[in-house]
Amino acid sequence: MLKLLQQYEYKIIYKRMLYTCFILFIYILGTNISIVSYNDMQVKHESFFKIAISNMGGDVNTLNIFTLGLVPWLTSMIILMLISYRNMDKYMKQTSLEKHYKERILTLILSVIQSYFVIHEYVSKERVHQDNIYLTILILVTGTMLLVWLADKNSRYGIAGPMPIVMVSIIKSMMHQKMEYIDASHIVIALLIILVIITLFILLFIELVEVRIPYIDLMNVSATNMKSYLSWKVNPAGSITLMMSISAFVFLKSGIHFILSMFNKSISDDMPMLTFDSPVGISVYLVIQMLLGYFLSRFLINTKQKSKDFLKSGNYFSGVKPGKDTERYLNYQARRVCWFGSALVTVIIGIPLYFTLFVPHLSTEIYFSVQLIVLVYISINIAETIRTYLYFDKYKPFLNQYW
């Protein structure tokens, strides 16, 4: 029997896919457990804000245990990333347990603030005064921590970490959008479809194209025709910046509302200046998106560590001295790549958002197109992860000889 099981051994990709499906089942089940009935929710016309929340696994159409999604977790990752960016050596020396505790404690604090904001903005005033608000906050925080735990487990034993949860949330949001009669000419509709297709091709270009910086490899003496190069993606941060930027924007809005409400109880919940119906709100979001895209890309590239690796191995760039000169050269190249990639993604997301200010009657269709773009971008990253595991399965018979 043991021999039969070894003969038909499941590949690692199948095991991980099965685990991810189990995580998604729990997530879908949790989103259907409502804390407050739909009739007690406030009707908000800011549709893109709801769509933005769904891009992080949340849902504010109904108040369920997973309403906050991964917003507090992603926001805590942003804060810790920006703090550690100034001293990468100290960050690399931290144990995984230290990083885990810092991340979870900060997530817990942010989820309390986010819960307070969501309850006051999306639940009717009568229901807020009737119910125990602290108990509702406790339920939301508990659900958020559970979802973070599921995403963390999926990172270890599943596929692509939080990406599948976000993808299911986006699909659910797209299915619940009500498409009304489009009051536009066929030329305008055709133009929108063409722009979406062009955007998808640009995103595919960003993911597939990489920048190659050739260097001299001292160990490469046998194959003189084979050049060694350092490769970076055009957008090293990938699709995670789209979720992080929305998370940071949501936290900024909820944080400002939380602070102002402490001094003025009659403060407006809508805060029209920080919505996607306002050019100021869109501009603030795009600035956050661009800055986070740049800093996260620089964080992942880690030119300081790369220059140390070159110094240890003896490899060097033509015309560049080892050590500090190599680090300055890599920083120069990294700035060019990271700013270009971050700016390109920001422009792709920003054009349709500003377009909704000029043609508000097409805002639902444009938001749907933005969600479709984000969905394809995330799908590309998930497909890249699956391809990596397939490579592992391909070489598994060879690797098993040494394990």
UniProtKB/Swiss-Prot annotation:
InterPro entries: SecY/SEC61-alpha, SecY2, SecY_dom_sf. It is a multi-pass membrane protein. It is found in: Cell membrane. The chain crosses the membrane at residues 17-37, 63-83, 105-125, 131-151, 157-177, 186-206, 240-260, 276-296, 339-359, 366-386. Keywords: Cell membrane, Membrane, Protein transport, Translocation, Transmembrane, Transmembrane helix, Transport. Pfam families: SecY (PF00344). The keyword ATP-binding does not apply. One of its GO terms (biological process) is intracellular protein transmembrane transport. One of its GO terms (cellular component) is plasma membrane. Its main location: membrane. The keyword Manganese does not apply. Belongs to the SecY/SEC61-alpha family. SecY2 subfamily. Part of the accessory SecA2/SecY2 system specifically required for export of possible cell wall proteins. The central subunit of a protein translocation channel. Component of the accessory SecA2/SecY2 protein translocase complex required to export cell wall proteins. May form heterotrimers with SecE and SecG subunits. This is Accessory Sec system protein translocase subunit SecY2.
